[in-house]
Amino acid sequence: MGHRQYKIVFTFIVEFGDLENKSLLLAKSLRRFYKDANEYPIYAVRPRRGKEIKNSTKEQFKALDVIYLYSPVNRNWEFFDFANQVYGPALIEELIDGKAEFMVYLDADVVCLHLPTELSLPDNCLVGITPVDIGRELGNDAAIVAEDSLNITWELAYSLAGVRSIPKWNVNTKVEKLQIYPYFNSGFSIVRPEAQIFRLCRDMFEMVITKNYFRYFNYSGKLVKTQNDTKKSSLFFIDQIFLTAAILSKCSREQIQIFGNEYNFPFHFLKEIQSEPYNLEYIIFLHYHNKFYDLKWQSNVRLDSETREWLANNVPIKLEKHVSYKIRKYMRYGRTFIKWHFNAIKNKTESD
């Protein structure tokens, strides 16, 4: 593949408010192990319009050799937070194509606890990723049990990505170990930029808008939890559905490395996965969600002394008082607010 300027480029999303503190924690944790910014650049991307991040955040990014990039590429889906997780990495993927061997995307609420020993891919692989956390019974209505039929949301995703048939292999959810059709968690991934996986996923998002494919999604605010009703999947999971379809379009099974739980461990399901005392000594990337706003979690968790000391100096993170208008509305009215935004976009496209 020839000489590349960078071995690995890391990237994550940052926006004004809560994501600032989370992304700073992630950046600090990465720089513990990847100190050379010339070999391991880190990009903090703000891919949609909104209030600028604080100057203090920018200064801390600079001290950590983190490149802050504001580029409002997410315009058609700027009402939907999770679309940032596609538009942001797609932007960096394109920017570093031909310059970096690998790009690692991480959700902002992830922290690197230990040095990744396998953060690369075999020569024949184009992507590394982990399966989704849970199945339908626990709330992920896009998880289709193996040998069941696809719903129309997945059929649309396959069609937009150019996937011709259902793969003949399966994955297991992290929590229940439920066997499902390939369906990946978008919180951690490592890709070869030249594979253009995130760019395909971004293009799929754009096609939903331009082709008016809204009827393929459930955005009523109700998650479907029973196997008897698999007609549509929630808009809530569209980023993971589309990313999975993009991966299946670009890669054969042999070109996909499926990492273990230690590379994207769902901390909020700790009790369901492990028994006490809970062991985090082997965890590489911990997906902590909202668990680091206090220290309640640490009393019965086993950790090596070095990692425990580092966390003691950096956690809990501050819960920002400011919450964006969109998030406040979402917290107050739930997914009905997404439905309202979705209908607004739908009506706009129908009138054009």
Show where each model-derived region lies.
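Glycosyltransferase catalytic domains, chiefly GT-A lineage
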Residues: 1-352
